[in-house]
């Protein structure tokens, strides 16, 4: 047991000092001056007439306990006045109602919800509109998204080390303010770039017949060049501020919760916190999607429709609202004290669950408060094999989560032949209940079964193994819908194996441009690249169901009895029979992946000493982001690109992929997923065997601690009452 937590070694040596003289009282290691201690004479005078010859035998021990308690108060609490909720000297009684772990959890959940909604919701929803509005390439928008993680990695060491030994709510409050500034900066280009103006081509498809202009593509590509792409630097700055502001949230916020609640309740509090962070992106997708249905120039009339490839929605509204909300959330967080009332009693409980360490830093209460201790703090963590292995296991899980959350909708879009919005909606229906429910359930199970240390790691092993087995779902795939010139030949022609040819005799009369990708489904069940490549000579007419219908298409074999020769705008529906089973198993993969997230985080908090928890979480986040969150989307994107059949042509440069080979996509995702899942399983196995269980059970200590009702009393009285 660390001496600074309870001082048990001095208490156990009580019999040795029973018959010592009053002058034998010595300094217990505190910096308290002798004049501040009660003398035996003053103690005797306090007792009055009840004093006896035997009483002085105990008075020095009482004096020593008082000095020890005073020493403990210096480390455990700065005094009752520091536990009031408010701002500076303004601490009204009405605010103390919120000065509880539940009250702080509410505002912390609001901050994590807002961060998830902004960074993981709005950004992913509007990134395509930003590319179109500011003439950005995909790699440029990818750099904008990565700027968040880059900033977080750069700040994690500083914030977790100094913030962990500082006033955590103030760090969290200022972080929320920086997050709000980042949102306002991100919306700034809308107000400085001028109005969005676009020329609309009202001519029909029939104008593409006749002579093709050889320099038409070069002229259009030249006209597209502009200085709008330089605004990517403003977007990157906004994302950098997002990363800086969110850094304290998942390090200091977690440790502050863990420090101020009972150790068995900590997983539930942390699970609720992370569940709010997962529900945030879901709200971001819904709100961001709704805002994209509003034209970016609010109040200006336009002939564009939401189906037009030139349409740009009001992507900036969500960021303005997020910036204002962040400022409002920061105000109450800044008012919380360094420690919540009654938190002193949990120090001993947390120390009892910490694995046995030989770093000797726990004997020095002043350790970790200066920059000179930073190298030693890093070295202590690097010598902790359990901590390192849990970090590596978290990195493998983060790689899968980041990769699948980015390209999961694309997988559904290709496998089930869905539109981008339909695929994103379907993926959201799976992620919200599976991710949010798994996160909350993981914390509940740890508390329900009172798992500790090695038991938590065993639970992580079970979850990882289950999700690993369920990952074999990617052995299944849906067959590709037939697409003329890509997966099958046109009517009356054969498609050479391994070659693409969109041109055929049936569309030779039309000057079709490959950049005009507008898929349509023919009445023969085959999908075509565009109305032009389907040989449709006239524009679309509105059908009975409100869909655009093209008639008399020369590439579609016409039969009067069946009505062939027509086509409907959009992709052909998939006839995949394994879709229900595939969705169920993907749900299992997601829920068991998130089920181990809170237990793994709890295990990390239990394998390091108390004063290093914030710093340990910061180091872990650096490892997770550097080895997982940042390279995850890049690795999965590279793997998925290997399955591409048809690439977009952007003025001679390769753009995004239009058509994937479903079988290859499933196979590559299976290989990548199993690789990271097996690595994560092995890391958890090694962490389980290297974890050193504490020698003292926290359950026994918990029974000896003062009740919650007395936790807000004088810390000196609490420690004296335990003797």
Swiss-Prot record:
**Listed transmembrane segments:** 103-123, 143-163, 170-194, 228-258, 278-298, 313-337, 381-402, 423-446, 451-473, 583-605, 615-640, 674-691
Q: Which residues form the Kazal-like domain?
A: 500-557
Specify the superkingdom. Answer: Eukaryota
Record has Glycosyltransferase as a keyword: no
The protein in question is named Solute carrier organic anion transporter family member 4A1
Family of the protein in this entry = Belongs to the organo anion transporter (TC 2.A.60) family.
Question: What intrachain disulfides are recorded?
Answer: 506-536, 521-555
Which biological processes are named by the entry's GO terms?
Answer: monoatomic ion transport; sodium-independent organic anion transport; thyroid hormone metabolic process
Species of the source:
Rattus norvegicus (Rat)
Q: Catalytic activity annotated for this protein?
A: 3,3',5-triiodo-L-thyronine(out) + L-glutamate(in) = 3,3',5-triiodo-L-thyronine(in) + L-glutamate(out); L-thyroxine(out) + L-glutamate(in) = L-thyroxine(in) + L-glutamate(out); estrone 3-sulfate(out) + L-glutamate(in) = estrone 3-sulfate(in) + L-glutamate(out); taurocholate(out) + L-glutamate(in) = taurocholate(in) + L-glutamate(out)
- One Pfam match: OATP
Main subcellular location: membrane
Phosphoserine occurs at which residues?
39, 42, 45
Glycosylation: which residues? Answer: 215, 566
Kindly state which keywords UniProt assigns to this record, in alphabetical order: Cell membrane, Disulfide bond, Glycoprotein, Ion transport, Membrane, Phosphoprotein, Transmembrane, Transmembrane helix, Transport
Among the GO molecular function terms of this UniProt record, one is: sodium-independent organic anion transmembrane transporter activity
């Amino acid at each position: 047991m660390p001496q600074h937590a309870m001082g048990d070694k001095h208490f156990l040596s009580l019999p040795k000092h029973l018959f010592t003289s009053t002058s034998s009282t010595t300094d217990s290691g505190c910096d308290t001056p002798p004049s501040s201690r009660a003398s035996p004479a003053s103690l005797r005078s306090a007792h009055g007439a009840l004093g006896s010859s035997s009483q002085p035998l105990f008075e020095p021990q009482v004096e020593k306990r008082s000095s020890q308690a005073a020493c403990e108060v210096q480390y455990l609490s700065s005094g009752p006045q520091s536990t009031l909720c408010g701002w500076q000297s303004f601490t009204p009684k009405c605010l103390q109602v919120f000065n509880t772990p539940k009250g702080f959890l509410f505002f912390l959940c609001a901050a994590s919800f807002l961060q998830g909604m902004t960074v993981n919701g709005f950004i992913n929803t509007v990134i395509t509109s930003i590319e179109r509005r500011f003439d950005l390439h995909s790699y440029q928008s990818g750099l904008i998204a990565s700027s968040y993680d880059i900033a977080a990695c750069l700040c994690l060491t500083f914030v977790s080390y100094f913030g962990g030994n500082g006033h955590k709510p103030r760090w969290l409050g200022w972080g929320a303010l920086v997050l709000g500034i980042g949102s306002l900066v991100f919306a700034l280009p809308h107000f400085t770039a001028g109005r969005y103006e676009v020329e609309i081509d009202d001519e029909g498809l029939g104008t593409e017949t006749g002579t093709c202009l050889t320099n038409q593509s070069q002229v259009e590509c030249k006209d597209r060049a502009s200085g709008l792409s330089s605004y990517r630097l403003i977007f990157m700055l906004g994302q950098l501020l997002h990363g800086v502001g969110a850094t304290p949230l998942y390090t200091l916020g977690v440790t502050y919760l863990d420090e101020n609640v009972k150790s068995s309740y900590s997983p539930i509090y942390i699970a609720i916190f992370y569940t709010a962070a997962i529900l945030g992106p879901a709200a971001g997708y819904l709100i961001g999607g709704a805002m994209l249905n509003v034209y970016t120039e609010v109040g200006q009339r336009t002939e564009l429709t939401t189906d037009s490839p030139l349409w740009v929605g009001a992507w900036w509204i969500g960021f303005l609202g997020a910036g204002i909300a962040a400022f409002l959330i920061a105000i109450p967080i800044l008012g919380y004290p360094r420690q919540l009332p009654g938190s002193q009693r949990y120090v001993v409980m947390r120390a009892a669950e910490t694995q046995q360490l030989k770093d000797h830093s726990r004997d020095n209460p002043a350790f970790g408060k200066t920059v000179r201790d930073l190298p030693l703090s890093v070295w202590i963590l690097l010598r902790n094999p359990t901590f390192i292995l849990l970090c590596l296991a978290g990195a493998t899980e983060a790689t899968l989560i980041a990769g699948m959350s980015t390209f999961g909708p694309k997988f559904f879009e290709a496998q089930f032949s869905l539109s981008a919005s339909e695929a994103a909606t379907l993926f959201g229906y799976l992620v919200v209940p599976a991710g949010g429910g798994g996160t909350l359930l993981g914390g509940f199970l740890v508390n329900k079964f009172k798992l500790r240390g090695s038991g938590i790691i065993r639970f992580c092993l079970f979850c990882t193994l289950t999700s690993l087995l369920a990952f074999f779902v990617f052995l299944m795939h849906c067959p590709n819908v037939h697409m003329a010139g890509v997966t099958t030949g046109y009517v009356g022609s054969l498609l050479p194996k391994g070659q693409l040819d969109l041109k055929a005799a049936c569309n030779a009369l039309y000057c079709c441009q490959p950049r005009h990708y507008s898929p349509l489904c023919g009445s023969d069940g085959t999908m075509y690249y565009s109305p032009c490549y389907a040989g449709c000579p006239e524009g679309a007419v509105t059908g009975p169901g409100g869909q655009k219908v093209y008639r008399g298409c020369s590439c579609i074999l016409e039969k009067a009895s069946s009505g062939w020769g027509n086509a409907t705008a959009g992709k052909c529906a998939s006839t995949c029979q394994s879709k229900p089973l595939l969705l169920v198993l993907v749900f299992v993969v997601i829920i068991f992946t998130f089920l181990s997230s809170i237990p793994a985080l709890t295990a990390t908090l239990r394998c390091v000493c108390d004063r290093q928890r914030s710093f340990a979480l910061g180091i872990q986040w650096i490892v997770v982001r550097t080895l997982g969150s940042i390279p995850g989307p890049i690795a999965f994107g590279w793997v998925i690109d290997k399955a591409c059949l048809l690439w977009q042509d952007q003025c001679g440069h390769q753009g995004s992929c239009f058509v994937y080979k479903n079988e290859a996509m499933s196979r590559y995702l299976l290989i990548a997923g199993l690789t990271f899942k097996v690595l994560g399983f092995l890391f958890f196995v090694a962490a389980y065997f290297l974890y050193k269980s504490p020698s003292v059970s926290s359950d026994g200590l918990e029974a000896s601690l003062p009740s919650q009702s007395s936790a807000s009393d004088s810390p000196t009285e609490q420690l004296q009452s335990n003797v």
